[in-house]
C-alpha cells in the first residue's frame, strides 16, 4: 500500500503504464500489486534482455515510469545492468521517473540519478481500494518477436483472475496452505501466471538465478 501511494504521488493514474526491467524478487511482486491496486497497467522484461529488446517492447506502450534494478544474479555472478538502463531511458522519451531496486545496500552511489525503491516505502500507507471495470487492463505481454518487432497483448483483470484461479484450483489442485514454485523470469508469461497463484491464498516461491547453479538440482531442494 505504501508503494501504491507513492505511485499516486508521481501523478500516475488509472490506465497509465509502468514498465519494469527487473529480476524475479519480492520487490517486483510489491511493484506489480501496487500498480494493479491503482489501475496502472504493468509490463515487464527480465534483466538478461539486451537494451534494444527492451526498447522494442516498452517504447510501444509509452510508460511514464520505469522500474528496474541495479543488479541481477546468474550462475553465481552479480551482473550490473545500469548501463543498459541508461540506453533504454535515452530511447524512450515517455519515461519521466526511474525507480531502482538496490540489490547491494552498500552501493548507493549507483542510484544517484534515480529513485531508490527503499525511499518510496517511507511514505504513509493508503489502504483504500478503488473498483475498476471487469476488463480493465492489468498488464501487457508481448509476442516473441520472431516475425518482426514484438506485438502488444493486453490482458484484462477479471479475465486473468478467473482463468488463473481455474487453472490453479481445478487443474493443479493448489490450496491456501500450499507453496507454489515455477522457474521463470519476468520476461516470460509464466511469471504473471506464478503471481496469479497468490489469489488462491498459497505462498509463492521466487528464484533469481540459473536453475542449474550451483548444482543441477538446485530448484528441487
Task: List each model region and its residues.
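Short hydrophobic/charged patches on amphipathic alpha-helices used for structural packing
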Residues: 4, 55, 86, 129, ...
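Conserved pre-ATP/AMP-binding loop-to-beta segment of ANL
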Residues: 99-100, 112-142, 149, 157-164, ...
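Conserved AMP-binding/adenylate-forming
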Residues: 4-55, 179-184
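Short hydrophobic alpha-helical segments of the AMP-binding
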Residues: 31-36, 85, 196-198
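ATP-dependent adenylate-forming carboxylate-activation enzymes
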Residues: 22-23, 43-59, 72-73, 77-81, ...
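Conserved AMP-binding/adenylation subdomain of ANL enzymes
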Residues: 161-179, 188-221
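ANL superfamily adenylate-forming
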Residues: 68-134
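Generic beta-strand/beta-sheet core signal
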Residues: 21, 45, 69, 101, ...
Amino acid at each position: 500500500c505504501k508503494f501504491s501511494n507513492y505511485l499516486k504521488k508521481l501523478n500516475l493514474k488509472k490506465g497509465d503504464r509502468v514498465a519494469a526491467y527487473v529480476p524475479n524478487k519480492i520487490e517486483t511482486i510489491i511493484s506489480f500489486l501496487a500498480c494493479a491496486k491503482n489501475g496502472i497497467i504493468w509490463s515487464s522484461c527480465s534483466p538478461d534482455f539486451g537494451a534494444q529488446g527492451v526498447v522494442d517492447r516498452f517504447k510501444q506502450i509509452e510508460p511514464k515510469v520505469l522500474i528496474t534494478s541495479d543488479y541481477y544474479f546468474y550462475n553465481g555472478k552479480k551482473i550490473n545492468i545500469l548501463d543498459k538502463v541508461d540506453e533504454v531511458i535515452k530511447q524512450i522519451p515517455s519515461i519521466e521517473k526511474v525507480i531502482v531496486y538496490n540489490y547491494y545496500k552498500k552501493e548507493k552511489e549507483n542510484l544517484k540519478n534515480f529513485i531508490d525503491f527503499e525511499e518510496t516505502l517511507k511514505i504513509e500507507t493508503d489502504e483504500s481500494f478503488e473498483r475498476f471495470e471487469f476488463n480493465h487492463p492489468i498488464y501487457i505481454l508481448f509476442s516473441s518477436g520472431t516475425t518482426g518487432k514484438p506485438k502488444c497483448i493486453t490482458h484484462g483483470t477479471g479475465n486473468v483472475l478467473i482463468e488463473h484461479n481455474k487453472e490453479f484450483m481445478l487443474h493443479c489442485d493448489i490450496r491456501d496452505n500450499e507453496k507454489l514454485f515455477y522457474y521463470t523470469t519476468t520476461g516470460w508469461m509464466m511469471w504473471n501466471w506464478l503471481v496469479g497463484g497468490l489469489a488462491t491464498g498459497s505462498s509463492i516461491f521466487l528464484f533469481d538465478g540459473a536453475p542449474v547453479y550451483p548444482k543441477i538440482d538446485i530448484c528441487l531442494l
